[in-house]
C-alpha cells in the first residue's frame, strides 16, 4: 500500500512540475520574441532600443538561466546589469538622476547583442 501511495504522490508531483514548466514556456517565448523584435532588428532606431533597455534587463534577470551563453558572456552580462542597476540607483539631491541614457546605451549595446544571440538560440531549441 505504501508503494502505491508513494507512486501516486510521485506522479502528482511530476504532473505539477510539468504543468508549471508548460505555463512558463509561452511567456518566455513571447517575451523573447519581443526582445528580438526590438534589439535584433537593425531598422529599429536607437531611441526605441534605449527605451526598451529596462525590459531587456528584466528579461535577462528573469530568464538568464535559460539563455545559452558562454561563461564569458554571462559574466559580462551580470557585470553590466550590476553597473546599470547602480547607475539607476544614484540619487542627486534625493531624487533619481536624470539623463545619461546615451552612456547607458553605449554600456549596454554589446550586452544587448550577446543577449539577443542567446535569445535567438533559445527560441530555436
From Swiss-Prot:
Record InterPro entries: Turandot (IPR010825)
Signal peptide positions on this chain: 1-22
Superkingdom per UniProt: Eukaryota
Subcellular compartments: Secreted
GO biological process: cellular response to heat; cellular response to UV; innate immune response; response to bacterium; response to heat; response to UV; response to virus
Assigned keywords, A-Z: Immunity, Innate immunity, Secreted, Signal
Gene Ontology cellular-component annotations: extracellular space
Stored Pfam families: Turandot
Family: Belongs to the Turandot family.
Cited function: A humoral factor that may play a role in stress tolerance.
Protein name in UniProt: Protein Turandot F
Organism of derivation: Drosophila simulans
